[in-house]
A protein has these predicted regions:
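Aromatic- and charge-enriched surface segment that lines or borders ligand/interaction sites
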Residues: 82-135, 166, 313-315
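Periplasmic-binding protein-like
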Residues: 45, 290, 310-353, 397-398, ...
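Gly/Pro-rich hinge or "lid" segments in bacterial periplasmic/extracellular proteins
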Residues: 172-173, 180-255, 265
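N-terminal lobe/hinge region of extracytoplasmic solute-binding protein
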Residues: 36-88, 213
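Extracellular/periplasmic solute-recognition and catalytic clefts
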Residues: 37, 221-230, 257-311
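Surface-exposed binding/hinge segments that line
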Residues: 131-196, 224
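Extracytoplasmic/peripheral linker and loop segments enriched in polar/acidic and small residues
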Residues: 336, 414-423, 450-529, 556-570
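Structural transition elements
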Residues: 337-379, 391-395
Length: 570
């Protein structure tokens, strides 16, 4: 009898423990939550997510790299389970072996070491344009591969089994910095079979969104451009399906519904009316009212105007300097609300000599936050050009301010506001005079952000039409021998503190030549209904971690959310 009672009690305890591991009952899938993450994007290729903050916010939910940077700016393991260093100085042999965790793609296939290797080889393909290429140049033969001097098969990275990636380096490097850089969204794993098929069928991998296969906590399960985006829990994300792990063991929300039919202003009104519960982009007209309530963090990006130096109006450095000098960046930050006046290209969130050491604080102010119109007019006061922007309230407001200032000097400025797809085409083809870019620092290290202005590190490969097969400059067309030498010296220096000197000199020279005009350091600001949602976490890159987000009494909201989902799919 005592044994029977003990068995019953044990069974009851186990049942209680199992229930405590899940928020679901029976066949339930979980909460459907209406959110607004940011403005619509049209390219979901993580290797190209560096022209605006919204792309980072969305793709950060879909993909997971080997490491991550937490909200405190510290490197953490993500897909990477462990690593070990193998050194043989006598043979000049330096390697890192990275073991990845057991997880699956959103279609149920195991994430393999080969998926990481493929993604990196894709970035280093001479015919593929990607600014993140320089992050991989420490790998043996990487630069030669990107320049077309070596075969991709000569690249020093390989999958030695299903879970281990072996990286061979050109020399002894700062291994901690390499791991820090692996948090870059561009370096996440990709499936070769998926990318190849989509590029063949659709002409572009990143635009075949309705069937996108991802390894992060969420997966795209429905998309109607200009209308809605539906992100469902990736049911294979770290779950042990053989042992029947609870559906919500690693990702609690079942579905995130994003309304793109409404803009930031309309979504802000919907938030105020209780129709959505998380607002990741606050309407411009309401920002001042939310300044105290919003959670605000500094981003790894700078809103910048790129000057196409191949255009006659921008070939003269004095014109570029004049346009920069005339702007009151304090006023621009005031217009945007959630921003700081830019005093250089690199924002304060980027590290310098060590983790947590601010590059911007150490480098000081390279450009003034205040306007000097008289000084600007002494440099240049005439010219005509078109300013290309994305068609949204914030970029329009900034552009109208700049246009007013510049036309007051004597310039003629035309603003061209484009959809996301048309904007990307203009940016990638260089079909612009001046273009607004949320310039993303790909990592917490300043090297990658500065190196792209050296053609050898631009990620654009080589010009096969040129008899010298020269490296193709970055989209602004900037090419300065003195600047390029500073970047080469920084790349050759393995001591992070010593390398800092070259990088600061490079930024100073860039701001003297001004092929890019930094305006504001971007900030992220969001609000959510704390009576309904909890468990939202931040990341250093500015996207949210919704894995453990809970919706109070979510079953009461289920009918409304389900109706929204149904309407969106019709």
């Amino acid at each position: 009898m005592k044994k029977l009672i003990s068995l019953v009690l044990l069974t009851a305890m186990l049942a209680t423990m199992l229930v405590g591991c899940t928020t679901l009952e029976g066949d339930e899938k979980g909460a459907i939550i209406n959110v607004y993450i940011g403005s619509e994007i049209t390219d979901y290729d993580p290797a190209l997510a560096y022209t605006d903050d919204s792309a980072v916010k969305v793709l950060g939910l879909l993909y997971e790299g080997l490491t991550r940077i937490n909200a405190d700016g510290k490197v953490e393991n993500a897909l990477m389970k462990s690593y070990k260093i193998i050194e043989n100085p006598d043979k000049d042999d330096y390697r890192m072996q990275i073991t990845i965790k057991n997880t699956k793609w959103s279609d149920g296939r195991v994430v393999a070491a080969d998926d990481v290797v493929y993604a990196w080889k894709r970035i280093l393909d001479p015919e593929f344009t990607c600014s993140a290429a320089a992050l991989l140049f420490d790998i043996k033969n990487a630069r030669d591969v990107k320049n077309g001097d070596n075969s991709i098969d000569d690249l020093g990275v390989a999958a030695i089994d299903d879970t281990v990636i072996e990286v061979q380096f050109e020399k002894k490097i700062d291994y901690n910095l390499f791991l820090e850089n692996l948090a870059c969204l561009a370096l996440v794993p990709l499936r070769e079979d998926i990318v190849t098929r989509y590029e063949k069928e659709f002409g572009s991998f990143g635009q075949a969104v309705s069937t996108l296969c991802t390894n992060g906590p969420f997966a795209v399960k429905g998309l109607a451009f200009g209308k809605t985006l539906q992100l469902d829990r990736n049911v294979y994300y770290y779950r042990d399906t053989d042992n029947e792990d609870a559906l919500d063991k690693y990702v609690i929300p079942y579905r995130l519904m994003i309304n793109f039919a409404a803009d930031e202003e309309e979504n802000t009104t919907m938030y105020e009316n209780g129709e959505i519960y998380y607002l990741g982009e606050i309407g411009l007209s309401k920002r001042a009212a939310y300044a105290e309530e919003a959670t605000v963090t500094d981003l790894l990006s700078t809103h910048t105007y790129f000057c196409n130096t191949s255009k006659s109006v921008f070939k003269d450095v004095n014109t570029r300097l004049a346009l920069s000098k005339a702007l009151d960046r304090n006023e621009i930050a005031k217009i945007v609300t959630f921003a700081k006046p830019a005093t250089g290209l690199i924002p304060g969130t980027v590290y310098d000599k060590s983790v947590g050491d601010s590059f911007r604080a150490n480098g000081g102010d390279l450009i003034s936050a205040s306007a000097d119109v008289a000084g600007a007019k002494s440099l240049a006061s005439s010219g005509s050009f078109t300013l290309t922007i994305k068609d949204n309230a914030v970029e329009n407001a900034i552009a109208e301010y700049c246009k007013g200032v510049w036309e007051g000097m004597g310039f003629k400025v035309t603003i061209k506001a484009l959809s996301d797809a048309d904007y990307r085409e203009a940016y990638e083809t260089g079909n612009y005079d001046m273009i607004a870019v949320d310039y993303q620092c790909l990592t917490t290290d300043s090297f990658a952000a500065l190196a792209v202005f050296d053609p050898a590190f631009s990620g654009n490969g080589i010009d096969i039409q040129n008899e010298n097969y020269d490296a193709v400059p970055y989209v602004v067309g900037y090419d300065n021998a003195e600047y390029n030498e500073l970047i080469e010296q920084a790349f050759a220096e393995t001591d992070r503190a010593a390398r800092s000197t070259y990088l600061h000199q490079a930024e100073e020279l860039l701001m003297k030549d001004m092929p890019v005009i930094p305006l504001i350091f971007n900030q992220d600001a969001y609000v959510y209904n704390s009576d309904v949602l909890s468990g939202i976490k931040d990341t250093y890159y500015g996207f949210r971690n919704f894995n453990k987000m809970k919706m109070k009494d979510w079953r009461d909201y289920q009918t409304t959310a389900a109706a929204t989902t149904t309407a969106a799919s019709e």
